[in-house]
Amino acid sequence: MDFTGDLADDLLFLKSMDIDMVGMGPYLEHRDTPLWRYREALPSQQERLRLGLHMVSCLRLLMPDINIAATTALQAIDPEGREKALEIGANVIMPNITPLGNRGNYRLYENKPGMDEGAEESTRRLMESVKRSGCEIQLDTWGDSLHFQNRVKK
């Protein structure tokens, strides 16, 4: 299957909506959804990872001043998926601070990373991985995108 045209249209749609932030990642099937029975028709997870990273890099070129999240869906396929996204265009990464007792209620896909880590451990590991990727975490800094800041000044 070739999704190139659809994905390009998605990027152009995001630009036309004048958005300030995007969180996107590869589609990950879940057994409790109607699409589960068609999972064999999906591209391989490695291909979905490649496409997801490609979308992040293309969106960064198309919209250089928005915030783009490095999502856990990328990490579900590749343990370094979020770091790879940071290296090619993402500029936002979020720790999982949901209390452990509630995490089971938020299973968007199989193999969601960090389901057994507490908020402190999740944040610590996240900070270490961001540092390894060569990026710098901006703590205690307002996170509005430059796009948003410029838009509200008008």
Each language-model region and where it sits:
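Auxiliary Fe-S-binding modules of radical SAM enzymes
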Residues: 15-154
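Canonical radical SAM enzyme core domain
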Residues: 1-9
